């Protein structure tokens, strides 16, 4: 294998929404992923897996890539990479990208993946929330029963950080507006949505 591809990580790492590997063909993307595994570079590998997700690759291919990446580079994988294949991930990014806050503050909009596999149909749902805590902290609070939504406490699988990275540290009023509008937009797109109030 040629080691001609440059490392992806830099001082200003790109957001997953920017899709820095979008221009790569399938072979070059596979080569970049193999190199990331060889270097135990979780960030570069995460961008490769993310690109597979956004291209709607075969679910088994994405699950296999996730497993290999976690095995080789667990300590350096960014928190925006989901831990499992999520069929609606491209839709989440596209929908969340339509929302922006103009005023800065300390409130964060976040998404939680919910497990609805026991209900038949789509195995996943989403919870849309807003908090002054980081999304990961707020998820932990939900799971611990602290001011928690029952659906997150019982069915919450993980925080989906990537789609809402640009919706962090917003003014409270803007975050509340975006929370409600994002929940409505995801529901209109056909997803099972909780929260958004």
Locate the predicted segments by residue:
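GIY-YIG nuclease catalytic motif and its immediate N-terminal context
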Residues: 2-133, 137, 177-178
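Structure-specific nucleic-acid interaction/processing domains
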Residues: 93, 99-126, 132-197
């Amino acid at each position: 294998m040629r080691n001609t591809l440059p490392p992806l990580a830099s001082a200003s790492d790109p957001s997953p929404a920017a899709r820095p590997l979008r221009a790569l063909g399938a072979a070059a993307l596979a080569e970049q992923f193999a190199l990331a595994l060889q270097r135990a570079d979780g960030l570069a590998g995460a961008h490769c897996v993310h690109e597979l997700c956004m291209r709607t690759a075969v679910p088994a291919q994405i699950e296999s890539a996730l497993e290999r990446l976690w095995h080789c580079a667990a300590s350096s994988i960014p928190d925006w990479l989901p831990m499992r294949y999520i069929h609606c991930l491209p839709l989440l990014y596209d929908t969340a990208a339509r929302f922006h806050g103009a005023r800065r503050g300390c409130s964060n909009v976040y998404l939680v993946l919910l497990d609805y596999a026991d209900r038949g149909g789509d195995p996943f749902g989403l919870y849309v929330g807003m908090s002054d805590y980081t999304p990961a902290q707020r998820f932990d609070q939900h799971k611990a029963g602290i001011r928690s939504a029952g659906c997150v406490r019982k069915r919450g699988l993980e925080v989906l950080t990537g789609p809402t990275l640009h919706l962090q540290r917003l003014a409270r009023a803007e975050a509340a507006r975006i929370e409600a509008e994002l929940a409505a937009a995801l529901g209109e797109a056909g997803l099972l949505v909780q929260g958004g109030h």
